[in-house]
Amino acid sequence: VTRHIPWIVTAIIGVVALTVVAISRGESVNALWIVVAAVSCFLVAYRYYALFIARHVMRIDPARPTPAVRRADGLDYVATDRTVLFGHHFAAIAGAGPLVGPVLAAQMGYLPGTLWIIFGVVLAGAVQDFMVLFISMRRDGKSLGELIRMEMGQVAGTIALFGAFMIMVIILAVLALIVVKALAESPWGMFTVAATVPLAMAMGAYTRWIRPGRIGEVSVLGLIGLIAAIMYGQAVAQSPTWGPIFTFTPIQLCWILIGYGAVASVLPVWLLLAPRDYLSTFLKIGAIAALAIGIVIMAPPLQMPALTRFVAGDGPVWAGGLFPFLFITIACGAVSGFHALISSGTTPKLIASEGDAPMIGYGAMLMEAFVAIMALVGASILDPGVYFTMNSPTALIGTDAASAS
């Protein structure tokens, strides 16, 4: 009983914080309450609900060989340290979605998005990711379409594979558009991103051949290299020689992305994909952690009300009522069907032990939900006039914060 006392206290803190967030009407609410509520709920859910699913629903057996062990080929099936695999999986599921969706949903107020993210991820989103990962792992790392074909027949499997293909085309097109817009004519950004490729390959070779299993060492080396790439990128951008070399048009970047995808798909996963995703996690989690620490220190009040008049569906940022459009707008961070494709992709082929599945499947989704919470908080602490000016068409709300208020 004694070992459960800290978790009981954490749960009580979470309930109190969530109650303050939910029942406050009219008065100012501190952003710290949302952060405390989310962190407390996520910790308790991971400690008890994920453990319950693992033990009593899936009956996870750490002694049972995983596909990465049984079918190890050094290419796709590679037993990977769970810390690296967590970073790989988290980077794959946490793209722009958990940032963009909550920011857009803030036009309805902070309360709907907060409740949906917390309860959605704990009861559904993380469970889905965990379950699909486990099922794929037990079926030799089969993809979602193949799993459906095995369970429901050839016709259903073919339809699922075609649907998954179309979803991937659409999602990759959107993500590529974001990347191209961010890196076009930006030598600083392009150099930093390009530097992560040889850096990741060096990390992969280090843990594979030089110092196997030394994740702490390679993490420090990778972090130093990443910081150096970011800092040196400014000098590259200002250089009359190197600046033009790393300056590309949108069309050129499209071809570069296609070429990178083709090369990455044939290289061993331990050489590029896994270490590069792990490396990028430093930036993602580091930025979110810094934002969380800033909120804890500054404790800013939420400027956005709990509910706005735009819950009816006539908002200037996007049109649509609370139901169902809130749940469509915030998918990544709460419940995302796209994650089923990731959880049945490379990840189940890399798990070294079934005991790592809760951390990777359930835990990574909770981390993405925390990213979504921080994005929602970041949007909600802005003055509403500033928020709508930044996110709405000028034809609807004007060109300054005063006209948007």
What feature does the model see in each segment?
Residues 295-311, 366-405:
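Extracellular/periplasmic helix-exit of transmembrane alpha-helices
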Residues 28-47, 51, 105-135, 145, ...:
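Extracellular loop-to-transmembrane helix junctions
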Residues 1-13, 44-99, 281, 320-321, ...:
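Membrane-interface "cap" regions at the ends of multi-pass membrane proteins
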Residues 18-25, 107, 135, 174-185, ...:
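Membrane-water interface regions at transmembrane-helix termini and the short interhelical loops
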Residues 51-78, 104, 114, 118, ...:
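Flexible loop linkers connecting adjacent transmembrane helices
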Residues 185, 204, 208, 224-255, ...:
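Hydrophobic alpha-helical segments and their helix-loop junctions in multi-pass secondary transporters
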Residues 14, 80-97, 249-267, 293-300, ...:
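Hydrophobic, membrane-embedded alpha-helices of multi-pass small-molecule transporters
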Residues 19-24, 76-139, 150-154, 170-185, ...:
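Membrane-interface helix-loop-helix modules in multi-pass membrane proteins
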